Amino acid sequence: MQETGVRNGAYGADKFGLKNLKGVKWNLTAPHLYEDALRAGEGVLSGDGSLCVDTGIFTGRSPKDKYTVRDANTENTMWWGGNQSITAEQFENLYQDFLKHAEGMSLFAQDLYGGADPSFQIKTRVFTEMAWHSLFIRTLLRRPETAELASFVPELTIIDLASFRADPARHGCKSENVVAIDFTRKIVLIGGTQYAGEMKKSVFTTLNYYLPDKGVLPMHCSANVGPDGDTAIFFGLSGTGKTTLSADPNRTLIGDDEHGWGKDGVFNFEGGCYAKCIKLSAEAEPEIFAASNRFGAILENCVLDPITRKPDFNDGSKTENTRSAYPLESIPNASPTGRAGQPKNVVMLAADAFGVMPPIAKLSPAQAMYHFLSGYTAKVAGTERGVTEPTPVFSTCFGSPFLPRDPSVYGNMLRELIAKHGVDCWLVNTGWTGGMYGTGHRMPIKVTRALLTAALDGSLRNVEFKTDPYFGFAVPTALPGVPSEILDPVKTWADKAAFDTTARKLVAMFQKNFTQFEAQVDAEVRAAQPEAKLAAE
């Protein structure tokens, strides 16, 4: 077997059971992986030097094909209401079949860290069949110093074989595509898909399982910090604006998607960003645009001009879920440490497909826990298979697909941290205004940015608020530089009766969804939900 690259010679591929390989390329850097990917026909270069790839039939995650081993360790610790199980025997069959499938292959291996805080990071080794997958995970996780690689011993091992096809009868899955996690053995198997996001979300799911026991709240959020050291957290599902809104030229970016919150503050799980780039423009998102159009970036499923090889970010013909992966250092004001102090503000982003929520509202601590557990947003087109237009959904903790433990574990931790550190909480609608999806339009990003700036610099605390008659949270009545009518959603609708009907419908949806959590929260949180009389009238 031919091996190249820097590695721990005493802890190689054989420790994972891989044998009869043609070779392993260890910890290659971006130039090497570009060359390997291009030689293998995995992608092409854009006119600006990005590596452009297609992910095939899977242009998003496939949560229905994700499984966790149910054993003595996970039986009573997993949230089985939100996760699918397979037996240890089925996983072992899958594992052995992965090893067999890999025989004769030349694999790529990366040794990386999940987590910027050394006290809580997980050492992760990722084997991939495709060169661009190796570049992707190297870009998205945190890279050790070269000197650390010689003694690197992984705690978590991932093997991603895109050409593998699972056997539902033998492996306990539903299709040929599979993502299987064994928390006891700390192994993740990914097969049948070229969508690289499955790798990063498997690391996230693993950290979500282990960190609560260490006193750290894992979060599906972005984070940044102001010049005065004021940290802000942005919760939200894919496509709601986490990446866009945290990339603020006046604030230091901690990270765009996954963080932990513990006794010393906030830390990024990752070393890169994975931004949606449909309709990306230099005018609206200059930092992300520049980071996406340079050497080292990976563009997924973007359409290129056949002559200039420039990407057309407005073309969603392959998928609405076009993506750009780039290292954090491509953002000029990104934090090199990936760490910051205790948050001063928590922002919950909701892409309200009904168009009845205000662009910003202030939440009490009880309301914050209520909306965190509710996780209202819209599944935005193309983020997951089978979703072609925004659909209103409730995704608890703004990340239901990634929660291995009961949502109340994360909800209670959030409430305790908010109370302990006196954090201000805000709900921000990045979805629709002037009507529901199909008749209204997306909230202007300039309005959202202006409101967020006012919230984060403290000036929004000094304006007049009124109580929203449907949802009960506090809504500002005016803010300099923002049209006052957009602050009150009913004023943006031509048909006021239709607004009232739609708002009551959404209130009822909130109430129905929250019944699953009522037994796990106290009276104060139960009282924070939209008032029942509005839906009943």
Curated annotation (Swiss-Prot):
Residues 312-321 have a biased composition (Basic and acidic residues). Binds 1 Mn(2+) ion per subunit. Keywords: ATP-binding, Cytoplasm, Decarboxylase, Gluconeogenesis, Lyase, Manganese, Metal-binding, Nucleotide-binding. One of its GO terms (biological process) is gluconeogenesis. It is an enzyme of class 4 (lyase). Its EC number is 4.1.1.49. InterPro entries: PEP_carboxykinase_ATP (IPR001272), PEP_carboxykinase_C (IPR013035), PEP_carboxykinase_N (IPR008210), PEPCK_ATP_CS (IPR015994). SUPFAM superfamilies: PEP carboxykinase N-terminal domain, PEP carboxykinase-like. It comes from the Bacteria. One of its GO terms (cellular component) is cytosol. One of its GO terms (molecular function) is ATP binding. It catalyses: oxaloacetate + ATP = phosphoenolpyruvate + ADP + CO2. Mn(2+) binds at K201, H220, D257. Its cofactor is Mn(2+). Substrate binds at R61, Y195, K201, R323. Residues 312-339 are annotated as: Disordered. It holds the Pfam family PEPCK_ATP. Pathway: Carbohydrate biosynthesis; gluconeogenesis. It is found in: Cytoplasm. ATP binds at K201, H220, G236, L237, S238, G239, T240, G241, K242, T243, T244, E285, R323, T448. PANTHER family: PHOSPHOENOLPYRUVATE CARBOXYKINASE (ATP), PHOSPHOENOLPYRUVATE CARBOXYKINASE ATP. Involved in the gluconeogenesis. Catalyzes the conversion of oxaloacetate (OAA) to phosphoenolpyruvate (PEP) through direct phosphoryl transfer between the nucleoside triphosphate and OAA. Belongs to the phosphoenolpyruvate carboxykinase (ATP) family. This is Phosphoenolpyruvate carboxykinase (ATP). The lineage of its organism: Bacteria, Pseudomonadati, Pseudomonadota, Alphaproteobacteria, Hyphomicrobiales. The gene is pckA.
